[in-house]
UniProtKB/Swiss-Prot annotation:
Residues 729-739 have a biased composition (Basic residues). Disulfide bonds: none annotated. Residues 704-725 have a biased composition (Polar residues). It comes from the Bacteria. Belongs to the UPF0313 family. SUPFAM superfamilies: Radical SAM enzymes. [4Fe-4S] cluster binds at C386, C390, C393. PROSITE patterns: RADICAL_SAM. This is UPF0313 protein YgiQ. One of its GO terms (molecular function) is 4 iron, 4 sulfur cluster binding. Residues 685-739 are annotated as: Disordered. Its cofactor is [4Fe-4S] cluster.
Length: 739
């Protein structure tokens, strides 16, 4: 893109002078023990990072990026990975940090990592050696912070990672089915960094190193802090209540009074006086030094409509070019959330990914297998961010809507490093992507629009005319990468946004011809307009167009390749009829899904707001605004999931029962247009056996009152009568001896 963005940082990420400890030189791995610190010549760590993941020195792991970034700034950084949280001892293994503790639950939310969408316990953990579950606690951010405070009470604790990022305000917690306070309040940490943390982390570390107390560091973007009142010099907008139209003054009648010149007298011209020219300072932009006061925690917990209102405001204040600060009351204090950080430039992204990662797990794990690492060890991350804005996804809220791309040279250098240094490389790059495969180098063509836009999605309901959809940079990158010596294949495993891809068929041709290993993942998520409108996903027309082009180019290349669509069940806005129509679509197109996903209400997502409140935060919120149907309850969620697997005989009884209740009994049978087969004789006998009335057998001697009783009542009455008879037998006098 030729135009220069108006969203620029105050200073470059790598422009800070290095901390004095840079004299110790580089570290092969960031130390996890005192022995490693001794080998590096360190007597202490300046910063200690605590994480719920195993330490893998790879740029796909957040703690590796943060640790290497801080080490490049000259700080001595240690890592405590998956500590024993039963006491404070494991949190003291590296000694007392000179500056602060950085705490994260890991690459995933600890609750999502631990529980399924049906709140069932998982028995594995892909971020743990040997896939062992139970190595991190529930709500790991809270637990780790508590132990850090117990270990060293006077050391600041800074929260980060996706778990803290998505819980920075009062939020609905699916696992406890209630609204919880901001994690910053519950944890009693000193600061929270949300989103990608390079900029705020580096700035805060240097300011702490220069002696500034953390209580006075309150102006850093991408951070949240606890305050007693609004920061000085900021003006506020009160949005604690729903907007209501005020009193409208009557419009004066233009001919109600005589005008000054109505007497037709000539008006003497006024003599213009010379005035000195004064240079006016530029007017401040309306979002500068402005905060929005959200409804308090107590209000959003007690009023679902106000919760939806607060959620809507938060999602509209995410553009770093025009976002205002947010403030939310929790008891007698406030959570103050600064505007998002300025996205990294291409040069800064290149520098971050050029840090000396070893691209392997820490040697302390030996030969243990870490599934998350196995998945990404031959993949390359080419960009960050996503402007899709899907309601159920947290990527936009975490990484931002502006795409941050690496340069072509930087990506090629990383591919060559994988080829030359990573053990077990066979010549196949497993993925060249990011949150979305085909958003590389795509940005808004209008700098002014990019700076001021508050749209939740750049592609829904239609692709914005300002959005650049030219895939030529991506195509050139693919071609250069696959021409490298020693590279046999470049696969694309990240999801493809097909509604953007159809705008540039050249990309689809390149993809189908060279970069698909038989199957390509895409995510229509649903086929019906009701749920799609709540998901902010395109209709099936874009999917059909993409499939047509993909099949055509695959055939031209002489390859037999298939699309694997992903769907979500039980999403807000999805009725039983919608799921039946989706199941019929799947059967018509001969799809039999093995893995299906029920909607998982994660914190901060718009879909989670719909799930909890029954309101639509994508439109203006009011007590009489649009209600959203929400499939809740285990039975209905099981049904929606079962309909995605209509071909599984175990789901047929549940589907038949639902079809009969909906008046769609014609979909049960052996005809081609039927969804499930009719029950067999054995199934009908088994159903009758299970539904058989278990009332006891009656005779003509059974009292009429007992006959009218239900089985439970009859059993209770029989038990009472038996007790009375036994009591009477005990009170009866004994017969005289010899009578």
């Amino acid at each position: 893109m030729s135009s220069i963005s108006l969203i620029q940082p105050d200073r470059d990420l790598f422009s800070w002078p290095q901390y004095w400890a840079a004299c110790f030189g580089p570290a092969p791995f960031l130390p996890m023990s005192r022995e490693e610190m001794d080998q590096l010549g360190w007597d202490s760590c300046d910063i200690i990072l605590v994480t719920g993941d195993a330490y893998v020195d790879h740029p796909s792991f957040g703690m590796a990026i943060c640790g290497r970034m801080l080490k490049a700034q000259g700080f001595r950084v240690g890592i405590i990975a998956q500590p024993d949280w039963s006491s404070k001892d494991d949190f003291m293994r590296l000694g007392k940090p000179n500056l602060f503790f950085g705490v994260t639950a890991g690459n995933m939310d600890s609750m999502i990592n631990r529980y399924t969408a049906d709140r069932r316990l998982r028995h594995d953990d892909a971020y743990t050696p040997n896939n062992v579950a139970g190595k991190r606690p529930d709500r790991a951010t809270l637990v780790y912070t508590q132990r850090c405070k117990e270990a060293w009470k006077d050391v600041p604790v800074i929260l980060g990672g996706i778990e803290a990022s998505l819980r920075r305000t009062a939020h609905y917690d699916y696992w406890s089915d209630t609204v919880r306070r901001s994690v910053l309040v519950d944890s009693k940490a000193d600061m929270l960094m949300f989103g990608n943390g390079e900029r705020p982390l580096v700035e805060v570390a240097h300011r702490l190193a220069m002696g500034e107390p953390i209580s006075e560091i309150r102006d850093v973007r991408n951070t949240a802090i606890i305050v007693k009142e609004a920061l000085p010099g900021w003006s506020g907008v009160d949005s604690t209540r729903l907007d209501t139209p005020g009193k409208i003054d009557p419009i004066p009648h233009p001919y109600g009074e005589d005008l000054p010149c109505a007497d037709n007298k000539p008006v003497a011209p006024k003599k213009q006086e010379a005035k000195a020219v004064t240079v006016q300072p530029p007017r401040p932009k309306p979002w500068e030094k402005t905060y929005v006061l959200l409804p308090s925690f107590e209000k959003v917990k007690g009023d679902k409509v106000l919760y939806a209102h607060a959620s809507r405001i938060l999602h509209h204040e995410t553009n770093p070019g025009c976002a205002r600060a947010l403030m939310q009351k929790h008891g007698d204090r406030y959570v103050w959330i600064n505007p998002p950080a300025i996205p990294l430039s291409t040069e800064e992204m290149d520098s971050v990914f050029a840090l000396p990662y070893k691209r392997v797990p820490h040697p302390a794990y030996g030969n243990a297998r870490i599934p998350a690492y196995e998945m990404i060890r031959f993949s390359v991350n080419i960009m960050r961010g996503c402007f899709g804005g899907c309601s159920f996804c947290s990527i936009t809220e975490h990484e931002g809507r502006i795409i941050q791309s690496r340069s072509e040279d930087s990506i090629i250098n990383e591919i060559e490093a994988i080829r030359d240094t990573v053990p077990g490389f066979t010549g196949v790059i497993s993925d060249l992507g990011g949150p979305t495969a085909n958003m590389y180098m795509l940005r808004c063509k209008s700098p002014r629009a990019e700076q001021t836009c508050r749209r939740l999605s750049c592609v829904y309901p239609d692709i914005c005319p300002h959005m650049d959809t030219n895939h030529e940079p991506t195509i050139n990158l693919y071609r250069r990468a696959r021409d490298l010596k020693g590279i046999k294949k470049i696969l694309i495993a990240s999801g493809v946004r097909y509604d953007i891809a159809v705008e540039d068929p050249r990309y689809i041709k390149e993809l189908a011809t060279h970069h698909v290993g038989g199957y390509l993942k895409i995510a229509p998520e649903h086929t019906e307009e009701g749920p799609l409108s709540k998901m902010m996903k395109p209709g099936m027309g874009s999917y059909d167009r993409f499939k047509e082009l993909f099949d055509t180019y695959s055939k031209q290349a002489g390859k037999e390749q298939y699309l694997i669509p992903y769907f979500i069940s039980a999403h807000p806005g999805t009725r039983d009829e919608d799921m039946v129509n989706l199941a019929l679509w799947l059967k018509k197109h001969r799809f039999r899904l093995d893995q299906v996903q029920n909607f998982y209400p994660s914190p901060l997502a718009n879909s989670t707001t719909m799930y909890y409140t029954g309101k639509n935060p994508l439109a203006k919120i009011g007590y009489k605004s649009e209600d959203v149907f929400v499939p809740k309850g285990d039975k209905q969620r099981r049904l929606h999931k079962a309909l995605l697997r209509y071909h599984d005989p175990a789901n047929w009884p549940l589907i038949r029962q639902a079809l009969e209740a909906m008046g769609k009994k014609h979909l049960i049978g052996s005809r081609r247009d039927c969804l499930v087969p009719a029950p067999t004789i054995e199934e009908m006998r088994e159903a009758r056996r299970q539904n058989r009335n278990t009332r006891p057998a009656l005779t003509k001697h059974t009292p009429m009152a007992t006959q009218r009783q239900t089985p439970a009542t009859a059993k209770k009455a029989s038990s009472t009568q038996s007790r009375l008879q036994n009591a009477g037998a005990k009170k009866r006098p004994k017969a005289a001896v010899g009578r």
